[in-house]
């Protein structure tokens, strides 16, 4: 992987040396970000920012995220950020397809500290933003806020995108 990351970074730097090179890892839990940072350094990968996805029901506590960010910044001298996150505001199935977060699947547990309501969503995201800021992170990208359900799309033709477009016309 490091050979591929180095090639990608070289391509970016060749095209425009002012563009920041970001490596996005899937998870910050259980020391994953620190392990990535160590491997990237040991393999001389030239990058600027180590980013991660963060979903509390999969990736652990905000305290863990903060610790991972601080270790990467202080030990490996790289900027950090959350490149992908979201938090459900409802567990309701409104489109006939299984939700990623649903009753019996990631809807409870120690790392899910806010209810799946509009206020719970707002609080969870605000807490994440505050944690990233406290750890010296660059910021947070909310993943796909346009994924709004459009009701039951069964029976419509085309792929899911076409079905949503047709439903909303």
Features from the language model and the residues they span:
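Aromatic- and acid-rich polysaccharide-binding/catalytic face
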Residues: 23-26, 33-63, 71, 78-90, ...
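Active-site cleft segment of glycoside hydrolase catalytic domains centered on the general acid/base Glu
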Residues: 1-40, 45, 60-67, 157-163
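Conserved, mostly hydrophobic/aromatic
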Residues: 8, 50, 84, 121, ...
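Structural recognition of alpha->loop->beta junctions
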Residues: 40-52, 111, 115, 130-138
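Aromatic-rich peripheral "rim/lid" segments of glycoside hydrolase catalytic domains that contact
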Residues: 71-74, 90-106, 110-127, 131, ...
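The substrate-binding groove and active-site-proximal loops of carbohydrate-active enzymes
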Residues: 1, 27, 51-59, 110-119
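Helix C-cap/helix->beta junction micro-motif
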Residues: 15-17, 76, 135
């Amino acid at each position: 992987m490091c050979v591929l990351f180095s090639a990608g970074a070289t391509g970016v730097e060749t095209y425009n040396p002012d563009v920041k090179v970001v490596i996005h890892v899937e998870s910050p839990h259980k020391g994953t970000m620190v392990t990535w940072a160590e491997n990237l350094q040991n393999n001389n990968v030239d990058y600027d920012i180590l980013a991660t996805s963060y979903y509390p029901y999969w990736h652990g506590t905000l305290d863990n995220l903060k610790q991972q960010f601080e270790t990467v910044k202080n030990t490996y001298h790289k900027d950090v950020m959350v490149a992908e996150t979201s938090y459900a505001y409802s567990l309701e199935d409104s489109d006939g397809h299984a939700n990623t977060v649903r009753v019996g699947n990631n809807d409870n547990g120690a790392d899910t500290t806010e209810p799946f309501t509009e206020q719970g969503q707002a609080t969870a995201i605000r807490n994440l933003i505050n944690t990233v800021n406290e750890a010296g992170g660059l910021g947070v990208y909310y993943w796909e806020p346009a994924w709004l359900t459009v009701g039951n799309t069964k029976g419509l033709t085309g792929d899911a995108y076409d079905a949503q477009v047709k439903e909303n016309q």
